[in-house]
Amino acid sequence: MLDVNSVRKHVLKTGSLTSAVGTGTIYQGTYNRYAKKKELNIIVTSSGSNNVIMRQVPLFDKEDLDAMKSDTTSNKYLHIGCITVSIEPLLHQRYMKNFGKTIAGNCAIIDSTFRKVDQSIISLHKYDLSRGRADYVSYPNHCLSLTDPMIQKRLSVLLGIKGIDVEPGVELFSICIGYIVSSVNTLHPVSQLGIQGVAINGTESADIDELGAEDIDQLSLSYNDSKIISLPSDEDIYYRSKGSLFSKGRTIKRRTMRTRVPDPEEPIKLTKSQSSRIEHGKVMRLLKNKQIREKIERGMIA
């Protein structure tokens, strides 16, 4: 079982909700040994209105999909064990103290291959930022086929944020979405029954029937009309997951992306950030080439 108080302390200390959730709370034995953890961090930029809507952010990028496809020789399915969502404001404390309660919205984990939003929802929760941040853990507990050509669209996050009225182009929020999955050969790799959700900070589980007409309209509109696109960033971060008495814990890579409001004529796309190690290699090659050219110019190299 998840120790909510322990998770809260870990999140406040490290900033990573995914690293606070142990794979052992989901999987046992071989499934636990080969479970995968990853995070996607998105810096959300204001559109100039008091609504910022993000739709269908896929959890899996090409790197993830390539790794999953390599498992198809020994496994048939991908079990979705856990999805974490954290929202952190990039706003001053006085504003958060006075208006944090009004910064609120809904977050849905969806299968975006469905044509209707109410049928696509896997998990739904409400949140507000009265506590300075919002954190939620969902246990979808279902399997996808590793050979499914649409697997990237089978797991996405649909998020609506309302209540901020600032100039366009301001970086308002850091949104971190993480997952814990395992490649399996059975459709029932865990003893857990059904789907479960755990509210950590400033969140509560919800059902679409409980939402008001305005909230449903917001989700429906964002399901069919993306308001942001992502830009690559060189700020990938590595976290050490919570360990146990006999284990140091896993290293989690957090991919980082930035967003901006798209031009109406510009196609909408989601681009994976580049690793800082790759960029470092490019810089070193450029420096080396520059040094060689300078030596040639000085006559030091024939």
From Swiss-Prot:
Query: What are the alphabetically sorted keywords of the record?
Result: Host-virus interaction, Transport, Viral movement protein
Query: Pfam families from the entry?
Result: MP (PF01107)
Q: Which GO terms describe its biological process?
A: transport of virus in host, cell to cell
Which InterPro entries does the record cross-reference, listed alphabetically? Viral_movement (IPR028919)
User: What does the UniProt record say this protein does?
Assistant: Transports viral genome to neighboring plant cells directly through plasmosdesmata, without any budding. The movement protein allows efficient cell to cell propagation, by bypassing the host cell wall barrier.
The protein's name is: Probable movement protein 4b
